[in-house]
């Protein structure tokens, strides 16, 4: 059996097994000497708060944002469809808290943008909607399939 030892003068406030040191932000880009940096800049994010970042509709009520991995928020959206569609596009650049459930192409792809916007407005308050779109190259048609289990 192991002998129990009491150490009254020792205080363990953060044991190594539990304590994880806070990491600084990762270095963005380290180039070998034989590469030459052609562009290196930092730009603030868009500050427009009265228009949806995906469909450009006026925000007449409380906007929805994309939640980031570290608990922050980015963007202003009129619906979950718009939020998830943009999140699908930027997920390789922005660390997201959760995987987007809906993925639509940007509105510039569609000939009848109003039809897509009407669908967004119709499903704005619905929960549990998921789906995506598929581009048919031969016929130049985009099939949108949004579903719900509820």
Curated annotation (Swiss-Prot):
Origin, by domain of life? Viruses
Q: Name one GO molecular function term.
A: zinc ion binding
Q: Where is coiled-coil annotated?
A: none
Q: Which InterPro entries does this UniProt record tie to the protein?
A: Poxvirus_VLTF2, Znf_MYM
Entry's Pfam families? Pox_TAA1, zf-FCS
Q: Which UniProt keywords apply?
A: Activator, Transcription, Transcription regulation
Can the keyword Repressor be found in this entry's annotation?
no
UniProt KW Transcription keyword: yes
Q: How does it assemble?
A: Interacts with itself. Interacts with the late transcription factors VLTF-1/OPG093.
**What's this protein's function?**
Acts with RNA polymerase to initiate transcription from late gene promoters.
Similarity section: Belongs to the orthopoxvirus VLTF-2/OPG126 family.
The identity of this protein, by name, is Viral late gene transcription factor 2
Gene from which the chain derives: OPG126
């Amino acid at each position: 059996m192991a002998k129990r030892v009491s150490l009254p003068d020792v205080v363990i406030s953060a044991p190594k097994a539990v304590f994880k040191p806070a990491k600084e932000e990762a270095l963005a880009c380290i180039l070998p000497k034989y590469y030459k940096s052609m562009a290196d800049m930092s730009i603030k994010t868009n500050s427009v708060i009265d228009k949806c970042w995906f469909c450009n509709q006026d925000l007449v009520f409380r906007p929805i944002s994309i939640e980031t991995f570290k608990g922050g928020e980015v963007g202003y959206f009129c619906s979950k469809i718009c939020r998830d569609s943009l999140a699908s596009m930027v997920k390789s650049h922005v660390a997201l808290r959760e995987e987007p459930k809906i993925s639509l192409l940007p509105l510039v792809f569609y000939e009848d943008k109003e039809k897509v916007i009407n669908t967004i407005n119709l499903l704005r308050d619905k929960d549990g909607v998921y789906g995506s779109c598929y581009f048919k190259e031969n016929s130049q048609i985009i099939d949108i399939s949004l579903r719900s289990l509820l």
